[in-house]
Amino acid sequence: MRKVIIMNSYLRVKTPYFLALYTLTFWTFNSFMGAKEQHHFLKKVTTTEQKFNSSAPLSYQSEEVRNSTSSRTVISNKELKKTGNLNIENALQNVPGIQIRDATGTGVLPKISVRGFGGGGNGHSNTGMILVNGIPVYGAPYSNIELAIFPVTFQSVDRIDVIKGGTSVQYGPNTFGGVVNVITKEIPKEWENQAAERITFWGRSSNGNFVDPKEKGKPLAQTLGNQMLFNTYGRTAGMLGKYIGISAQGNWINGQGFRQNSPTKVQNYLLDAIYKINATNTFKAYYQYYQYNSYHPGTLSAQDYAYNRFINERPDNQDGGRAKRFGIVYQNYFGDPDRKVGGDFKFTYFTHDMSRDFGFSNQYQSVYMSSQNKILPFKGKGEISATNPNCGLYSYSDTNSPCWQFFDNIRRFVVNAFEPKLNLVVNTGKVKQTFNMGMRFLTEDLYRRSTTRKNPSVPNNGSGFDAGTSLNNFNNYTAVYASDEINFNNGMLTITPGLRYTFLNYEKKDAPPFKEGQVPKTIKDRYNQYNPAVNVGYKPIKDWLFYFNYQRSYIPPQFSNIGNFVGTSTDYFQIFNVMEGGSRYYFNNQVSFNANYFVIFANNYFTGRYGDNKEPVNARSQGVELELYYTPIRGLNFHAAYTFIDANITSHTMVTNPANPKGPKKDIFGKKLPFVSPHQFILDASYTYAKTTIGLSSFFYSRTYTDVLNTVPFTQYAPTIKNGAITTKTAGMTPWYWVWNLQISSTLWERKKQSVNASLQVNNIFNMKYWFSGIGTSPNGKEAAPPRSITAYVSYHF
């Protein structure tokens, strides 16, 4: 144990020197070994580099997708940018099995669930490994799995690759829902520049249009000025000769979300570089600075929602954050995998320093009063503290309430990691084996600070400020993994067994300021986990693949409390066993069809916001996913998908009945997991003629439950006021909705390397009115979804 701590400290200080020494040694060794046959070797290595290209596939037509032994969807650049997507959340709506609850329209903090899991917790996406260019972007990829900050902006993205089965060996924990890899724009061969502007107009007036009747007679600029979102983008990139390439991107987002008084500001700067030493050795590096601030109006009571679903009754709901990310990758290619032996070696080092601050009042969980200062009709008995009997008579943000409190929850995540990885191909002709082996060592430093402000006029509240408590975590993880892809008869049969084994070391320390009489404590925990997986593929003919995969995945113990509320903190492992079987068929490059069945068995799954229960449950989610691509003629493309999900609780877990908190608890065995739409339809199409593209996209979600008791009618329960926190629970099924988007894109002018491109898109064409149940912004009440919006875009390439 003591040796691990010394090693951990050494790595944090000496990693850059270790990286340079390791890379130089490996490069020198390979250069020496290959020097005698350099004139033959370089030609072979070029082929090897192509076969081990680490870039994600470009579209569903790519060989990586055709031969994938799991369900896989690629959102190509054309689908991403020309079918009416407003942000990355919109784009992910095009993937079967992924469900999005977009409550802001800005794309700042996506709410993602996959195959029935992820709607709980504190609302921030905590299901599925989220990567940017293959690097994890969770603040703490092991002990704080949530997108508390999402350092990605829409205009910087090139495409998105989604794999939903058999990935635990390569990617580690939290892969039971799949892996989402966001690919940013790559460095082009020739130098290019781009300047672009994107403006979104929200139709958020009381009648859903762009000009509110109540503001009739006012100048148009005044009525529209407070409901616009500006998205400015600039980029310069290219190769400086044969060996060195650089890319610099900047993205600035400023304006309003679709709710009233919801200012949003984002800055995103990206620097990428590549150094091609020779045909066998390459360095890549990146640096990113990302910062955001936003307000989240959260939920409304049913009465306020009916009055005006766009009002903001929670001005205290706000968050902000900053991310600094850096990484460097060295890659070496050797041999010829088509003949005997070949492959590539990759060494990756990455680090990030992320911080975020969530601020909200203790009315975070309440919908106890309407904006018209009327007490709401409640069901049930509720529970009122004798010391504060009238707290429920105050509005959401009234600081005069004797119960009013405001919480600041500051977190900082510092991660350092390195990973050597080897792909080795041994080809004997009839049998081809690809050995994939590697090791990842990762450290997490977490710094937590929570403060509270109270009403100073209330006795015993003192000055009204409580410094709270601080807690630091210093964790490290070592994972080793290996897999062997055995390929028979030129790909007719492929079997890939694999195993990943991880050592997890946790250390928690109390940090100042200490409360009177507090004795600082240090707690250390040591765990280990294994992830077996197997993928099988069979091709009766060249373009028809049958596949099956199994994986064991897990979520480690989590540290993610939010103030005094239920976060996602756990002291146990959540275990998932995932099986998937399906088939993928291609016909003449015109048709691609994938059908698969999946089942996920969850043990000790943390339900979080599903109720006041902190106890985990067992659950089973199973379903069918169908996906079709069809290109009948040149320029015309169709994409359709359907997902059925049946997610049930399989343990006898007792939960509190919100209608009678002190009464007997209820068994939720057999109940459906909340926030899961059993039926999901996807339909999008595009047609390109000359220099103009017309794109259409749509998504349908069936109704969902919002509580583990599966309440059908919308119900507002009597408030519970305890220890200064006010809770008014609600329950009831959300409505179904089918949203349609339309975009027209065209090249307006073109001359040599210069061009002007523009587009006009309408999202939620029919102004579908629907709501969610406050996932991540306030867990009770109705949270409005984005209304109709119009987005204008213009870009100059030169």
Regions picked out by a protein language model, each given a short descriptive name:
Residues 221-297, 318-333:
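Transmembrane beta-barrel wall of Gram-negative outer-membrane proteins
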Residues 331, 342-363, 539, 545-555, ...:
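Membrane-embedded beta-barrel scaffold of Gram-negative outer-membrane proteins
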Residues 423, 488-495, 504, 598-601, ...:
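Gram-negative outer-membrane beta-barrel transporters
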Residues 57, 72, 89-136:
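Extracytoplasmic beta-strand/coil segments of soluble accessory domains associated
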